[in-house]
């Protein structure tokens, strides 16, 4: 089933990611009543010579930067750091990059008016200090209580986002607190710093340990402070003395509608090189499908990436997904369930700019009514063959179940509860160093032709497809998503689609 684990030394292993879905490929490309339009904005806490990367001094600045898009009907659907800035990764220039995904409904030819009851919200970002220590149960309970309390006031949860207290300390490897002259020097040389990470001695390496060695060398010249070092357990998201945690909402002026939020299981197996996480294993659909089929939306995730200094390094990571249930008065709240797509994406960073990402795929799926609700960045890093930094991201999309579509049958067994023995039976798939050369994306704007990739069909270095007798994808045909062979996916057996991109 699926791609399985693939040999890292395979010279032709150049897959930029995988796709998992609760649907057959023809159903994925079935047109729905509505489609979406997306805008992807990149922000940085550093100066950048690229005008498309927006400079901010704080996460809070994003609110004013997206106001014009809200006037045009867009809303923020997801916000996330480009890489997961844990451990020495805080010193990477890419740790200062943030992605904001905005969406709005695109009316189909069948409909000439927006759905009734649609209201225009405003973006709100609030600091969210945690009073309890960042342990799974305590943090989950406290965070869920906070966002449920806000939801009663017409605040629709978007996600959590963290920012280092001293961004220049982590983005550039130095601390310029109170030193204006040094700060200006950092702003002037930020692009040079970005290039040095990509054009240094590690250019062309795909070794995780090589990346960590460079980080360790660069950061070793700075003294480590007790409880404030990059490797300290205090750098956990939400609790860190060197991090601020923010909560992002879409706020509505009235509280006539409400949402409720609950947690769900998130457990991942990991492999490490020393203390560094090099691969992650998780069956995303096994963990989430039950909630999707109940009509819930996966909004965000909260993972405890780091352990206290001196503690045993675990072989699994725990956290939780945050799911949203729409209350009365919300348009579309009567729908019975959601189908899902999960994408394991290698995102490539050239200098301080994103070169390859999930944008082209997102614009393609938008035409078929797929809504991006969450992106989980991971600490898994590598260099591609060109020496650019690549990081693994997990992208979650959903669409209401099309009960009346003749092309779709309901998956009866995929909604089983993930608890007890079912949880232990979850099949894991490697999403770590399973590729060597991620393929470059086109523009982050909708491409003229964006093609999905086939299951177990992986790109060769010559750009050809190596067929492994599974379903189709990235093609040159008129259809963006080629049809699957009928016998290769049995929804009644609860088998999920897997695609190598």
From Swiss-Prot:
- Chain intervals with Polar residues compositional bias: 224-233, 427-440
UniProt KW rRNA processing keyword: no
Q: Where is the lipid attached (N-myristoyl glycine)?
A: 2
Mark the residues carrying the PTM Phosphoserine. 405, 430
Q: Which Pfam families does UniProt cross-reference here?
A: Raftlin
Q: Which positions does the record annotate as the modified residue Phosphothreonine?
A: 409
| Gene Ontology CC annotation, any one | plasma membrane
Q: Note whether Plastid occurs among the keywords.
A: no
Q: How does this protein sit in the membrane?
A: Lipid-anchor
Keywords from the named record: Cell membrane, Lipoprotein, Membrane, Myristate, Palmitate, Phosphoprotein
Cite the record's Basic and acidic residues compositional bias ranges.
410-425, 442-451
* Chain positions covered by the region annotation Disordered: 1-20, 196-238, 407-454
Q: Where in the cell is it found?
A: Cell membrane
Q: What does this protein do?
A: Upon bacterial lipopolysaccharide stimulation, mediates clathrin-dependent internalization of TLR4 in dendritic cells, resulting in activation of TICAM1-mediated signaling and subsequent IFNB1 production. May regulate B-cell antigen receptor mediated-signaling.
PANTHER family in the cross-refs: RAFTLIN-2, RAFTLIN-RELATED
Give the record's family classification.
Answer: Belongs to the raftlin family.
The protein here is known as Raftlin-2
Q: Which source organism does the UniProt entry give?
A: Pongo abelii (Sumatran orangutan)
């Amino acid at each position: 089933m699926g791609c399985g684990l693939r040999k890292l030394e395979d010279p032709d292993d150049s897959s930029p990611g995988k796709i998992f879905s609760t649907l057959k490929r023809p159903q994925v490309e079935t047109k729905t009543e509505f489609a979406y339009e997306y805008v992807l904005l990149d922000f940085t806490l550093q100066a950048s010579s690229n005008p498309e990367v927006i400079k901010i001094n704080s996460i809070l600045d994003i609110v004013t930067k997206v106001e014009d898009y809200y006037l045009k009907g867009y809303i923020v659907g997801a916000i996330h750091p480009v890489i997961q800035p844990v451990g020495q990764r805080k010193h990477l220039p890419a740790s200062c990059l943030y992605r904001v995904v905005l969406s709005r409904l695109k009316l189909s030819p069948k409909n000439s008016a927006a759905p009734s009851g649609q209201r225009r919200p405003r973006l709100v970002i609030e600091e969210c200090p945690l009073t309890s220590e960042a342990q799974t149960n305590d943090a989950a309970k406290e965070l869920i209580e906070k966002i449920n309390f806000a939801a009663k006031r017409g605040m629709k949860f978007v996600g959590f986002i963290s920012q280092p207290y001293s961004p220049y300390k982590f983005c550039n490897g130095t601390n310029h607190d109170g030193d204006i002259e040094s700060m200006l020097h950092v702003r002037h040389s930020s692009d040079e710093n970005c290039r040095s990470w990509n054009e240094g001695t590690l250019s062309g390496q795909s070794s995780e340990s090589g990346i960590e060695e460079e980080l360790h060398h660069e950061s070793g010249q700075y003294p480590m402070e007790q409880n404030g070092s990059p490797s300290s357990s205090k750098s956990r998201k939400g609790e860190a003395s060197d991090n601020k945690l923010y909560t992002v909402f879409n706020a509505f002026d009235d509280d006539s509608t409400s949402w409720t939020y609950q947690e769900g299981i998130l457990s991942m197996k990991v492999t490490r090189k020393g203390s560094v996480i090099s691969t992650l294993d998780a069956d995303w659909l096994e963990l989430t499908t039950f909630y999707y089929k109940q009509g819930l939306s996966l909004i965000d995730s909260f993972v405890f990436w780091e352990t206290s200094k001196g503690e045993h390094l675990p072989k699994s990571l725990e956290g939780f997904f945050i799911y949203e249930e729409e209350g009365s008065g919300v348009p579309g709240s009567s729908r019975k369930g959601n189908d899902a797509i999960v994408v394991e994406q290698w995102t490539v960073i050239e200098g301080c700019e994103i070169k390859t990402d999930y944008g082209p795929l997102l614009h393609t799926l938008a035409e078929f009514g797929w809504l991006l609700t969450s992106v989980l960045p991971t600490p898994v890093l590598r260099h591609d063959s060109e020496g650019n930094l690549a990081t693994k991201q997990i992208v979650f999309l959903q669409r209401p179940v099309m009960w009346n579509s003749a092309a779709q049958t309901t998956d009866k067994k995929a909604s089983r509860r993930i608890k007890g023995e079912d949880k232990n039976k979850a099949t894991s798939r490697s999403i770590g160093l399973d590729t060597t050369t991620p393929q470059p994306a086109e523009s982050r704007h909708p491409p003229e032709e964006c093609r999905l990739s086939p299951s177990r069909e992986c790109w060769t270095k010559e750009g050809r497809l190596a067929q492994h007798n599974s379903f189709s994808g990235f093609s040159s045909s008129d259809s963006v998503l080629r049809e699957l062979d009928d016998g290769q996916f049995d929804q009644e057996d609860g088998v999920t689609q897997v695609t190598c991109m």
